[in-house]
């Protein structure tokens, strides 16, 4: 499969929507795009590439391809600094559904990123407010995100920035909505009461302060969220809509997740990619 990124590497000035047949193709595209960005920076500076990372089922295929590239010698994370976007409050780090466990299982234990460059919020910190403030500062001290890789919830939330989160929010403690706990119950024996009630999360403004944002959205359950984020007003009701105001935002989706946008919008995004890759 050929991956062409010249139009993105050179002309990112507004939201782009990359539409692929299915999640497998979209995930491959995202992995190779991330790799291209890491290599691009490495070619011109010794400064580390700073990336924001997400969890959940959506990025697993992307992580798998990044792992394959590292093992094949096509990519290295030795000069990459990562910050994960969220973590549950009160869930032991060793719990199989903690985001610490998830990231080590699906990415960190299989790549060459230095342990000291891996950052994940500590949901068991004695002072979670101080933990959030320190995390936000660490991102800034690292130089800010070169690229933030995120997913989107069925209600349009990014990270754990639930509907009505301020678009100017920063890393903080949040209370999860019942809808989110019910959706995430599939990871907790299908019991919403086992899903922690609170989490630590980077804020909407933390995400949007990244030099570039790449959002993965696959499947029909994400269709309404994408329609609201792409065609609706920018609103704290759909926190992904904040991407409308970002100069370098990209949504990678499949035919199912893009199915509710207007036909004219669909054709526009397909035409833009085709023309700029010509």
Regions found by a protein language model. Name each.
Residues 40-71:
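Glycine-rich N-terminal segment of FAD-binding domains in flavoprotein oxidoreductases
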Residues 64-76, 99-101, 163-172, 232:
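A glycine- and small-aliphatic-rich helix-loop capping segment at beta-alpha/alpha-beta transitions
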């Amino acid at each position: 499969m050929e991956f062409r990124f010249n139009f993105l590497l050179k002309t990112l000035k507004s939201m782009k929507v990359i539409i692929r047949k299915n999640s497998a193709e979209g995930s491959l595209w995202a992995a190779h795009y991330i790799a291209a960005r890491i290599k691009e920076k490495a070619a011109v500076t010794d400064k580390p590439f700073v990336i924001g990372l997400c969890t959940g089922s959506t990025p697993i295929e992307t992580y798998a391809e990044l792992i394959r590239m590292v093992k094949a010698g096509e990519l290295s994370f030795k000069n990459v600094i990562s910050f994960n976007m969220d973590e549950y409050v009160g869930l032991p780090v060793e719990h199989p559904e903690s985001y610490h466990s998830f990231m080590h299982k699906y990415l960190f234990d299989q790549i060459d990123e230095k342990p000291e460059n891996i950052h994940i919020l500590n949901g068991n910190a004695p002072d979670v407010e101080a933990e959030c403030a320190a995390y936000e500062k660490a991102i800034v001290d690292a130089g800010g995100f070169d690229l933030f890789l995120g997913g989107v919830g069925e209600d349009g939330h990014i990270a754990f920035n639930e509907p009505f989160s301020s678009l100017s929010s920063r890393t903080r403690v949040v209370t999860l909505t019942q809808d989110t706990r019910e959706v995430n119950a599939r990871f907790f024996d299908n019991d919403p009461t086992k899903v922690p009630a609170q989490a630590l999360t980077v804020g909407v403004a933390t995400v949007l302060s990244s030099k570039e944002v790449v959002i993965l959205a696959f499947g029909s359950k994400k269709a309404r969220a994408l329609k609201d984020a792409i065609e609706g007003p920018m609103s704290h009701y759909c926190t992904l809509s904040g991407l409308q105001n970002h100069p370098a935002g990209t949504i990678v989706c499949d035919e199912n997740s893009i199915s509710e946008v207007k036909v004219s919008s669909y054709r526009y995004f397909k035409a833009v990619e085709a023309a700029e890759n010509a």
